[in-house]
């Protein structure tokens, strides 16, 4: 049993990292912000940690919280120019940010190592450390979900105009979502750098962007467990489907299409909704009205 655990420990570690990235993406989508800046901020956190650890010899457990603060600041700064943008325009603007970060990582060779990246980063992150970091983030987001802020995020996602008419500061709460997302992304980016020995610019490109978005879409964006389940699917399914060789990507795509068609809210949120309907057939109020009433309270 122990040998089996050690055999699959690297896969578990990558799941924990992917879950952290997915939670960062989840928080902005839950607040109704179509941001895909997570990958860019993950890259910033990873390079920040790698540079500080290699040049100054600091422990990852000092560097990772500092990276989270850097990510929080980037999230706040991003929220300022994006305050007037909505929907696909937010997505395009944040994609531009990701490209800018990738260009800096690629061409600032004296600092980042350029296309070759940074190697020989001290490995100071274990499975237990990743579990602890994920547990802390889950606790914070879980506590937030049951507060007024969590209800406001739901109201903003469902109907921003109605939320604004209730006196909710849309700009402030979007900035808060960006800040939380940035802190989580940079934190797990730093932990990734302290785990995998080396980082390269291409690691933080379209593949990671697609993975984080797919994890939230598959799992759902209303419950904090949605991104966790989505990250598990995106991490473990390719390994389970390894005998299919290159057809594994086809399986991932088909699964995503099936979930979008039959469970448009995601696996977790969809199953929760089905369970609620069975318990309360037709008497419950519409979701938007429920969120609005919770915000008023």
Residue spans for each PLM region:
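Transmembrane alpha-helices and adjacent helix-loop boundaries
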Residues: 1-297
